[in-house]
């Protein structure tokens, strides 16, 4: 007799149960996040479906309970296109850095996605400020030109965690020295607190 247990730990199941998906990417515009996605995985497919259908009811329920549901978007460098292992390694490193700095109780990662232009890390946060501060700290150590947090609410504006595009333009126009930047602008903090 094989000793096979059908008992399942619900917490373990939720922690490790991911649904992989593929889709046809659409042209991404400046106001539409995630339409460039062609592959991803998620632990909460209903949240992704609601976002793509522009239905904020689920996100509203989370927000009413003090939970922020969103994702970090960042551009994929040209040299990483088609290199799924390197893309996943970066996402894993970002998750580890956020967890280490913000704490395990601050966030639960739901999965991520790869698009034609951007990578995405999906999560729900109980302490959004700690999560975004941790992400911003990690991202400033990378060479990425920008990274943003966006709620799973399509009509919301992004909160930029990193934006070197202005620095680059300023440096090209004024001086060869890079400009210093703060992690979150006062406007971004107000938006985050309103969530």
Where on the chain are the PLM-derived regions?
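Charge-rich, low-complexity segments
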Residues: 1-117, 126-136, 140-174, 183-191
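Short cationic amphipathic helices and targeting signals
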Residues: 119-124, 195
């Amino acid at each position: 007799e094989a000793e096979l247990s059908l008992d399942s730990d619900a917490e373990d199941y939720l922690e490790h149960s991911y649904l992989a998906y593929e889709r046809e990417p659409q042209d991404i515009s400046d106001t539409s996040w995630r339409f460039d996605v062609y592959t991803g995985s998620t632990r909460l497919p209903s949240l992704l479906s609601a976002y793509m259908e522009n239905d904020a009811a689920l996100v509203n329920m989370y927000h009413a309970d003090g939970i922020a549901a969103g994702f970090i978007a960042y551009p994929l460098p040209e040299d990483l296109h088609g290199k799924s292992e390197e893309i996943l390694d970066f996402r894993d490193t970002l998750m580890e850095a956020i967890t280490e700095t913000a704490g395990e109780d601050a966030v639960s990662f739901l999965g991520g996605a790869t698009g034609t232009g951007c990578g995405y890390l999906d999560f729900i946060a109980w302490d959004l400020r700690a999560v975004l501060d941790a992400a911003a700290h990690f991202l400033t150590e990378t060479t990425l030109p920008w990274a943003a947090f966006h709620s799973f609410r399509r009509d919301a504006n992004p909160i930029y965690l990193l934006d070197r595009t202005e620095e680059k333009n300023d440096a090209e126009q004024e001086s060869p020295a890079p400009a210093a930047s703060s992690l979150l602008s006062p406007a971004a903090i107000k938006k985050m607190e309103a969530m």
